[in-house]
Amino acid sequence: MTHQFPALSPEQKKALSDIAQRIVASGKGILAADESVGTMGNRLQRINVENTEENRRAFREILFSSDASISKSIGGVILFHETLYQKDSSGKPFPAIIKEKGMVVGIKLDAGTAPLAGTNGETTIQGLDKLAERCAQYKKDGADFGKWRAVLKISSTTPSQLAIQENANTLARYASICQQNGLVPIVEPEVLPDGDHDLQRCQYVTEKVLAAVYKALNDHHVYLEGTLLKPNMVTAGHSCPKKYTPQDVAVATVTTLLRTVPAAVPGICFLSGGQSEEEASLNLNAMNQSPLPKPWKLTFSYGRALQASALAAWLGKSENKKAAQEAFCKRAQINSLACRGQYVTSGKTDTAATQSLFTASYTY
């Protein structure tokens, strides 16, 4: 018989479960503000703003210093290492600002992808070295949850069984290390939207990936009540000629989750995967309106799909701060409604909200 050493104490389990429940409390989701320096540079480049530490800090200050009502829509904020140690213009650390609003601070923990030998261009994730020490330090510095993103792609030869197993195992090792150090692990196995595959192919692959992930989490004695899942929605490939409705996406996604994700998991926080802001909200809303059983909270962990309108309103100008904050708050409120299946689209959305945010082979 297998045994878990060291086992989590009842107190550790309760602390992890409480954090996870706070993040996905009713109508709340996650703001993913953990873009790396390079990825943030690409975002700033689109609005002709230079990628400096100050500009990155200034934009994130806009998001974090938004009206206190934002905490009704956002339960947690994922930060990049740089951002965890930055301050607002008055000298207050960002984690303190986030916590004062009643939101939970998270930290990106993976160190990006590395080629996986023996596969056709597939990858595994780096960052397990010294992860326990990093988790302990981040916990001291104010973080209460972590995030680790694994990436799988769909093609005629991928994902391979090797890539699925390797990434599932790495996610499980990360999750176990997080929990030993008091951090709730967000488990993110992303099946990329690149390609021309249809909805059914994405569903088949996502089911295989999630089944492998939960087998690995069980093998590694991960306490599921103290975790969150951040999966892709089940959508057709970006180049698929056939278009599907939000209802199609909802049925395929919820069916996939029912087949693979234990009811013990408190919340499923979808990534937006390059969908437009509006598309991501409509798909989430359709899932929460679905008559299928949903034993977990279905919510969001959006980066691009929460920030695009705010970036477009800001344009790097301090005088646009209020407009950018209003755009961000509006999008957060829409997604909060979508978490409850209560979003009714007016049909009038601005260009930034309907623009595709897809980037091929997207890296964070």
Curated annotation (Swiss-Prot):
Substrate binds at residues 56, 147. GO terms for biological process: fructose 1,6-bisphosphate metabolic process; fructose catabolic process to hydroxyacetone phosphate and glyceraldehyde-3-phosphate; fructose metabolic process; gluconeogenesis; glycolytic process; liver development; negative regulation of pentose-phosphate shunt; positive regulation of ATP-dependent activity. GO terms for cellular component: centriolar satellite; cytosol; extracellular exosome; microtubule organizing center. It is an enzyme of class 4 (lyase). GO terms for molecular function: ATPase binding; cytoskeletal protein binding; fructose binding; fructose-1-phosphate aldolase activity; fructose-bisphosphate aldolase activity; identical protein binding; molecular adaptor activity. Pathway: Carbohydrate degradation; glycolysis; D-glyceraldehyde 3-phosphate and glycerone phosphate from D-glucose: step 4/4. The keyword Flavoprotein does not apply. The record marks 364 as: Necessary for preference for fructose 1,6-bisphosphate over fructose 1-phosphate. It is found in: Cytoplasm, Cytoskeleton, Microtubule organizing center, Centrosome, Centriolar satellite. The active site is at residues 188, 230. Keywords: Cytoplasm, Cytoskeleton, Glycolysis, Lyase, Schiff base. InterPro entries: Aldolase_I_AS (IPR029768), Aldolase_TIM (IPR013785), FBA_I (IPR000741). Its EC number is 4.1.2.13. It comes from the Eukaryota. It catalyses: beta-D-fructose 1,6-bisphosphate = D-glyceraldehyde 3-phosphate + dihydroxyacetone phosphate. Belongs to the class I fructose-bisphosphate aldolase family. Homotetramer. In vertebrates, 3 forms of this ubiquitous glycolytic enzyme are found, aldolase A in muscle, aldolase B in liver and aldolase C in brain. This is Fructose-bisphosphate aldolase B. It comes from Gallus gallus (Chicken). The lineage of its organism: Eukaryota, Metazoa, Chordata, Craniata, Vertebrata.
